[in-house]
Amino acid sequence: MQEFLASTNFTVIFISLIGIKFLLETYLKIRNLKSIELNKNAIPERFVGVVTEEEYKKSIVYNIDRIRFQIFTALFGAVVLIIFTLGGLFNFLAEIVVSTTSSDVLGAVLLGLLLLIVEQVISIPISIYSTFVIEERHGFNKTTSKTFVTDMFKSLIISATISSIIYATVIYIVVNLGDNWWIYAFGAVFILQAIIFFLYPVLIMPLFNKFEPLDNEEFKKPIEKLLKKVDFKSKGLFVMNASLRSTHGNAFFTGFGKNKRIVFFDTLLKTITPDEMEAILGHELGHYKLGHIRKTLISSLVFGFIGFYILSEVLKSDNFFLDHGLESLTVYSKFLLFYLVAGSYTFFTKPFTSALSRKREFEADDFSFQYTNGEYMISGLLKLSKDNASNLTPDSLYSSYYYSHPPIAERVASIENKLK
């Protein structure tokens, strides 16, 4: 591998991949826009009677606005990445840190913090426009400027704390534990992530939202009956004040082991019936009972293990980092640059992970169908689609590449086939 790393012109490859990624994804988004335009004059047959003409037109305008903004943000992100790397901004930050400390561990923390702050500042206009222009324009935004700023600072502090611990741990291991450091680093990061995942529902999520026990007996009784039927034990049923920020609805469960919690958006409880809620929850429980979470964890471990091995090899090559605009070649600057550019080398895996995710969504629907009423599954999905102004006519290539969930029409058709 070292011969390949030393002889390859990564500058050309890097720029080419950024260009290919942007052009491919822009092409798919334009296809999606055309699909929306082609179907704008008539409500899709399956949604007749579910959405009104006015609601359908609003969803069309909303999705067109979002896709156009996504094209802009993709271009913006590509330009920023090039400025960070080949433009020398990352190297400039690395040189500031090198002049400040000779400690690799402290350097990793300082450079990671600088990178995080710069990225946060750059992303602010994007977040503001998305929240206070697009979401506001279409009636979904409930976020106040105070909540927005508070969320931003909370997120920054939490990200800074977690990333500093991870970066310091990894760099300490790299410097002190010899050639097989990547095995120990992989294990350490896995343990840290497991701890974070365990603590997330009880320490981090409450910093952003209020969680109150579900006390609505009309919803609570059928849900508890379903939990008993599928033998699922949780820490409790909670309602999250999602309406503080948005009118979008959702339900999910978080944590693992004794910290498993089922969470419902308060916005969801206002729009669906208890029977529909039971069917939606049946889907979420399906992911757990069918081992999807365990399988995702195992695949993450495998890819993480491979990723750390590749990192261990790449760190030995100055050429890789010089070709990405880094001249201040410390172990921590190399590590963080690798983290920064890795996405450009792995984006092609997205359609495969999306396809696997959609397969598991169908399986979770099948699980829910076994334990709940299929008719209520359909009506619940249709309501969620309507309330979230989902794209009812997505382009097939676009959805194949991007969608982690099958289009609503496909999920409904699958359930209807089982009802026959």
Locations of the language-model features?
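Polar-ligand-bearing catalytic/cofactor-coordination segments
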Residues: 4-329, 343-420
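Acidic/His/Gly-enriched intrinsically disordered linker/tail segments
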Residues: 331-336
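Alpha-helical transmembrane segments
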Residues: 337-341
